[in-house]
């Protein structure tokens, strides 16, 4: 890879001069051609005849063509050199800006790229006393390091492409000038990348490393990615990746396996760029249609006769789709087509299963996260989980029937047979949450225990896709700034709450005899946390509470039941509690500090603000006790240690209030309250559930109730300090908030407990 000193100190002037010199040649060749034609050819015409003249004029005609070709070739080389200079100059400028930024932030960048934090504050007591300082410095260092690496990768790819273009013998053995020369670095890199991909599993480790460097450097470049995939074609794309993953899986600790792991990510991100219709150029609808057709075809992945597995194209593609954010125009039809195929034949992905005949796994997902890739639905749903626009369109749109070849069947219906006769698929949410649907173990391992574990990957990916569909961001987005909810998203949340909070919904996620969708409980909790305003409206019936965009119009009974089921998951419990406390704190601040014309006393407004959140907290307390003592799906320590993402959910809960209310508030609520609320949430979840006897007696919420009272009083204290209230008034309002929290928490817990009869 190009080094930092080399790029930083490189004198690019001679390259610019060379480009200018080559750029001047076409005009000179044109002048020579005109002079040759005038002084030689035209001079001889009409004065020389016979066989020798005929042969001479033919030779001179070829010479004239050579002048033309020489001019064309010189112009193209000039453009290539100019492009190289432009790119190198841009990378050099970016590198120098990063080095200046590093110095300004007290980082030292060594010549080998190693970065050392030399901030003098590390030697002061402030550093050790402030954990936030260490986090801030690490984030800056990581960002700087990744950006430096990116610039060097881009410069290296451009350097190698320029070298390959200039070393190419464009004239061939004839030594004649011609026009077969590269005109851009993208064209060179496309040829290099497709040539390696065409070798499939015959490519060397070094060649795969080069392919990865080219793809990674150009993954955001639509001209390169479109050219690469267009030249490779859908069939070869899937064929070469299928054979590479099958080969690499035989040696999971080898360099080759690591190269294929990296290739999976680079192919995914590059495909997302190439299929984005908002970018120019992009792959055509015909290319996309052919990819869908290939998805329903089987691929031979090994010449070994003892290797019987022939995956469908979608089983191969599923591994690539796990990486990248895809446009709905590309990804939604793939998801719809795959459902049509699976509904027509629920055993399609396992009808040629090698399980029971092979000792090793087979994978299209060498990254190893979320299964082996044997079930293509897992990969497709993961792709939707990173593509919120496509996920929303898929889950909120109509069910569309497709022919096997990937084209739409205008008059067709999607009907599925689970052994009790065919029935219509009501919606894609209905399809994936049907209790009779069998989730394919996302592994080819013949070990039955491993296969059983692998059935969790599909439902987990379904949860990820629903998170993206309802939130407008990828499921693994770590920020707090959230887009407002659309009407379609809010409607989908209503359907989800009705589904899992309605009859039979609890059995899907917490059933004692097996819960097929238990792995998606954390995602359902995240959805509730993202819709905390709607949730608090649902449990309280107060439609005046602020929501973030369109309202989900949640039913009270369904909302309570939904929270009770989902809250039994430690991760969901944390997200809901964190968002609830932040949202409630925002409501308390609004009640105490917001401008209002109402004559309702502030104490009553505070009680009203505390009530919905305390009700949610009560349901959560009882749900936690149920998980520990009833369904026995978790231990107290599972809830107590689950605090990594508290800050994210506190920030989102705060934003749901501050970003949605129209009544002015004093200052920036989200800014001043997040740190205090985060501390309060951590204290709230670090508790013990009731004893089993207390749980059986219906008193499993006492510890949680104390925490709800404390957090309500904390909210008043923060809002009071923020609004400049005197100590006595704050104390009185804290008492009011505490009483309301105690009563509402008890009501919420008892309502949840009553569901058990």
Write out the residue ranges for each language-model feature.
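N-terminal secretion-targeting helices of virulence/extracellular proteins
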Residues: 1-172, 749, 753-757
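Non-catalytic all-alpha helical scaffold/repeat segments
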Residues: 176-667, 671-751
